[in-house]
Amino acid sequence: MQKFLSNQNKLFLIFSIIILQVFLFKPIQVLADLPTGNAVKDPNAILRNALPIKQVELQEIQHKLEETSDLVRGGRWPALTKTVTKCQSLLKKYQSRIIKDLPNDKKKIAEKTFLELKENFDSLQDHSKAKDKYSFVSTRKEALDKIGGLEEYFLPNQFPYDIPEEFDDLPRLLGRAKVNIKTSKGDMKAIVDGFNAPLTAGAFVDLSSKNFYKDLPINRAEEFFVLQTGDPIGEAIGYIDPETNKERHVPLEIRIPDEKETFYNQTFEDLGLYTETPTLPFATLGTLGWSHSNTAVDDLS
């Protein structure tokens, strides 16, 4: 588990939606890496898009490469070759501009990464011409991981969003963390996004560090839809803060792309944003989220 920030001797960590990468029984990697048909449902793409950065050129390369998802699934090889050629062109066009915008201590490692990306793109061109789907997918993942790593170099030095003072007593995660989840059926790895849900993610990682979830059973399972856990043994239905002897509640957090601030304890209906998609959409396979009651949005615990 990675710890990011602390304040007033309390570990500040969090969550509202987190993306899981599941490795049960170590399946064949190329099969696990097959991209989904829609980038909005690809957890890795969502995490890249959710970074609070504005690096238009690098993100253009990312999005162009992600466009190959539908093409590779449909076996549209001529279009795939053309898209890879466009990626190569964008890389050559933007490389010096992107490196120039980086902090000085990141420039040399970025230059090396760009050389590796060029090799990846050359390999993708070869794989598309050979109609080698599995090699294409594997190399594509390597390239996107490198692009995501470059994007992280552009993260701001300070947390970019305000959190209301009324939640000062709650743990928060001002960044991202990795959490290992062990189950009787195998292990899972979760990437917890505190940029877009600092209080939810912070509470989740805080409870994880306290072993709150240890030995808790899965108390709800709906096939191909959802698994639920977190109901503690005894009468309590949530986490009881030992300092107050009361159930700790975490507010509902929603971030919407291009909105300046995070919304707290307001639903899309409350905001009148009926057609908007949150930065961290819940309809993605592998998403981890907290449930609240039918009567309140601020009783996550």
Regions found by a protein language model. Name each.
Residues Q2-F12, S16, F25-S301:
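Cyclophilin-like peptidyl-prolyl cis-trans isomerases
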Residues I19-L20:
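…; additionally, a secondary subgroup of soluble metalloenzymes is captured
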